[in-house]
């Protein structure tokens, strides 16, 4: 736990100079990214908290850090005495917006960098601040955390960009742009502005490496009825990228030109409206509801801009047949790597009695993955956790200080990889000794929830919000639960966390029905602080299913799991399973064995482990 006093003192000095009483520091970058480059880790620099979600609020006298249930334990360990932890979602705990507003009473000024907060979020915060008696929310264009950070702030990455060929992307750029223009035409819209990095990468069939674990690059895009413009540092583009963009009629402009161009376009459209006459564009500019307040302001704000769920994000979430085949294929290869890893780890710990720590295990898994076709890198830092560490939902082991894996305690491994044909995310919880009855019961309740969701059949139009209880039902019957969502969308060689779909209790999961081609995780869990944690995660694709009847002339949907890794036989309490659940497990084990055994010719150790862990459950 580092002392945050020096950076807080610098920030407060800068706040006083600007007559700011409350300063909001979001986690995200100017593209609303969940995972960010080191240069954008402002909240981490100021607070010491390294989780991927949260918001810091600093006043002249106090400081608070708000985060969700995935990070309660981690934040409690990382924050020093300067900070109050706001555990979001718990009863009687204010939201970060409420806490910030409460500090503004008496006409005090609340400020934020407008490039780091969505326009809709800024409006909500402003309303709450005004209601609490504060002054209007101030958009402070200079980021004063960056000033406090000074020369020690890392440089912005400038990694090369590569083309994702159509045989892997499944849909050409021209088709994607034309489909987007059709959406714009419905609203007589003069332009859509793309700010999310994964949306830009998907739209132009390009991939980058500016943000760790996410194959994206710093960029914006503007799509009008006549033009398509990519704003990017041109030094990132080699001749193959330039040729690819020329062939698809995409202009390239410098990254820093985006906001000046947006302001100029607003001026031009405003002039056309005022001039009147035939051909006048009457629609508003469209931006994502995740786009920054700064973008909305550049385009004229209210009256000129309409915020909506991004049509690019919606299209990206529905995988085409090529992408779905890629997801199937990469999960088989990824499953083979995990199977080889678990067999190796058990041999090291239980048979050879060799001490392996959490980071050494994670490094070995990455080494095994790297041997497989199309491997690019990890899709997030591996959560390799033993014993009580497994109860920390997003635990991050650190070299030199992490725990040695105890074969007599639960081991939880949540990991994933980026392959050029897809993105993986798999969690398995194992025990290399004799698990307790409590551990077996918890594991089996979680497994029953995973099966319940995997086997769900539901009418078209159903949201992930409606399905969440299927994964929790068996835990609920025992008075248990978990403080995270059940499922998130997954990109295709893109971000491992992808909207707009998901399975959980978040409001946004009520907005978009699941559709064939969606790819989601299925990851129920249970965590006993200070003791152990259980999580099991598969990746599933939504598909149409045939039913005996067709009530209301609706089509019905279900899931196809693509993860190919056995469950831990020693943690399964067989008497808790129904006959149908046992049949599902046996069919799954047969599927895993059939799809992965070909990778282990001549590898007796791994083949023996795979055979044992896929044996029939009686």
Swiss-Prot record:
Give me any GO biological process, just one.
proteolysis
Q: Which UniProt keywords apply?
A: Aminopeptidase, Hydrolase, Manganese, Metal-binding, Metalloprotease, Protease
- What cofactor does this protein call for? Mn(2+)
**What Gene Ontology molecular-function terms does this entry list?**
metal ion binding; metalloaminopeptidase activity
**Which SUPFAM superfamilies does the UniProt record give?**
Creatinase/aminopeptidase, Creatinase/prolidase N-terminal domain
Q: Read off the PROSITE patterns from this record.
A: PROLINE_PEPTIDASE
UniProt name for this protein: Probable Xaa-Pro aminopeptidase P
Task: Give the originating organism.
Answer: Metarhizium robertsii (strain ARSEF 23 / ATCC MYA-3075) (Metarhizium anisopliae (strain ARSEF 23))
């Amino acid at each position: 736990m580092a002392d945050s006093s020096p950076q807080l003192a610098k920030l407060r000095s800068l706040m006083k100079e600007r007559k700011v009483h409350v300063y909001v520091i979001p986690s995200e970058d100017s593209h609303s990214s969940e995972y960010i480059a080191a240069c954008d880790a402002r909240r981490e620099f100021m607070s010491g908290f390294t989780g991927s979600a949260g918001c810091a609020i600093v006043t002249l006298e106090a400081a608070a850090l708000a985060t969700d249930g995935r990070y309660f334990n981690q934040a409690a360990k990382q924050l020093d005495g300067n900070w109050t932890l706001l555990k979001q979602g718990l009863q009687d705990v204010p939201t970060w917006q409420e806490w910030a507003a409460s500090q503004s009473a008496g006409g005090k000024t609340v400020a934020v960098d407008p490039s780091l907060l969505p326009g809709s979020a800024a409006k909500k915060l402003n309303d709450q601040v005004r209601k609490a008696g504060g002054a209007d929310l101030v958009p402070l264009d200079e980021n004063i955390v960056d000033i406090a950070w000074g020369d020690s702030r890392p440089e912005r990455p400038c990694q090369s960009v590569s083309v994702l060929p159509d045989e892997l992307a499944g849909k050409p750029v021209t088709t994607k742009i034309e489909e987007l223009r059709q959406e714009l035409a419905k609203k007589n819209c003069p332009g859509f502005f793309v700010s999310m990095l994964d949306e830009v990468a998907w739209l132009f069939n390009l991939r980058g490496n500016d943000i760790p674990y996410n194959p994206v690059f710093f960029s914006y895009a503007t799509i009008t009825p006549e033009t398509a413009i990519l704003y990017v540092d041109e030094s990132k583009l080699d001749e193959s990228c330039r040729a690819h963009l020329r062939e698809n009629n995409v202009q390239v402009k410098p990254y820093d030109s985006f906001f000046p161009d947006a302001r100029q376009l607003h001026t031009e459209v405003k002039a056309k409206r005022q001039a009147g006459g035939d051909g006048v564009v009457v629609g508003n500019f469209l931006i994502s509801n995740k786009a920054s307040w700064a973008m909305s302001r550049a385009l004229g704000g209210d009256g000129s801009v309409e915020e909506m769920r991004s049509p690019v994000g919606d299209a990206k979430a529905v995988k085409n047949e090529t992408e779905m085949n890629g997801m199937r294929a990469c999960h088989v290869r990824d499953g083979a790597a995990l199977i080889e890893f678990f067999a190796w780890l058990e041999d090291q710990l239980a048979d050879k009695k060799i001490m392996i720590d959490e980071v050494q295990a994670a490094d070995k898994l990455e080494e095994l993955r790297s041997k497989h076709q199309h491997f690019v890198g990890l899709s997030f830092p591996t959560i390799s956790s033993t014993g009580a560490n497994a109860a920390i939902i997003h635990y991050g082991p650190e070299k030199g200080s992490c725990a040695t894996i105890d074969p007599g305690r639960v081991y939880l491994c949540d990991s994933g990889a980026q392959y050029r044909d897809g993105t993986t995310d798999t969690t398995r919880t194992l025990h290399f000794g004799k698990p307790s009855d409590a551990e077996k019961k918890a594991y089996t309740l979680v497994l029953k929830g995973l099966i319940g969701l995997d086997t769900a059949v539901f009418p078209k139009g159903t949201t992930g919000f409606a399905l969440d209880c299927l994964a929790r039902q068996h835990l609920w019957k025992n008075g248990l639960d978990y403080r995270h969502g059940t499922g998130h969308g997954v990109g295709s060689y893109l971000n491992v966390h992808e909207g707009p779909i998901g399975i959980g209790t978040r409001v946004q999961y009520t907005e978009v029905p699941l559709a064939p081609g969606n790819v989601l995780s299925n990851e129920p869990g249970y965590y006993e602080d200070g003791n152990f944690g259980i999580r099991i995660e598969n990746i599933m694709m939504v598909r149409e299913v045939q039913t005996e009847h067709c009530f209301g002339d609706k089509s019905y949907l279900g899931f196809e799991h693509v993860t190919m890794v056995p469950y831990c036989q020693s943690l399964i309490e067989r008497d808790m399973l129904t006959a149908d659940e046992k049949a599902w497990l046996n069919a799954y084990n047969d599927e895993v064995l059939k799809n992965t055994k070909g990778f282990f010719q001549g590898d007796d150790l791994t083949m023996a482990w795979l055979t044992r862990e896929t044996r029939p459950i009686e």
